[in-house]
Amino acid sequence: MTWRSEHIWIELITGSRKISNFCWAFILFLGSLGFLLVGTSSYLGRNLISFFPTQQIVFFPQGIVMSFYGIAGLFISSYLWCTISWNVGSGYDRFDRKEGIVCIFRWGFPGKNRRIFLRFLIKDIQSVRIEVKEGISARRVLYMDIRGQGSIPLTRTDENLTPREIEQKAAELAYFLRVPIEVF
């Protein structure tokens, strides 16, 4: 979502609360729970899941491996649910031409650096840069080159923008900030 006026441009960034992350976390949770139940039922010798009899799965080695995969999947699933609940990666980009300041804010993982806040002057921005990597997994990322601080990515690497969309976004931002565009 973007909000613009004559002097201020605010772009809200969605973090890890995306539909795909919810789906993957849910599928991974159910799958790993199934693996753990199968491993546990082979250990107990009782049928906890009615899809197939427990006599078909011997605890050593199949039951142990299934239990291990189930536990590992539950850990990964809990990691995904935590990143979703903390909304890691969300935030905003605020470009204020009137005050001459750019503010970039992102939420991180809990701890000392939970709030990531970058603030610098518009006059320190050298250019808006588009980095394009073509191939099987094409990637187009929009960067802002800052004098003395390097490049700051403005779009996520998993955000699959078409060439037209990334060019339009870069052109609008470069026009708003009155800086040149570079393409690599």
From Swiss-Prot:
Keywords: Chloroplast, Membrane, Photosynthesis, Plastid, Thylakoid, Transmembrane, Transmembrane helix. It is a multi-pass membrane protein. It is found in: Plastid, Chloroplast thylakoid membrane. The keyword Transmembrane helix applies. Its main location: plastid. Belongs to the Ycf4 family. Seems to be required for the assembly of the photosystem I complex. This is Photosystem I assembly protein Ycf4. The gene is ycf4.
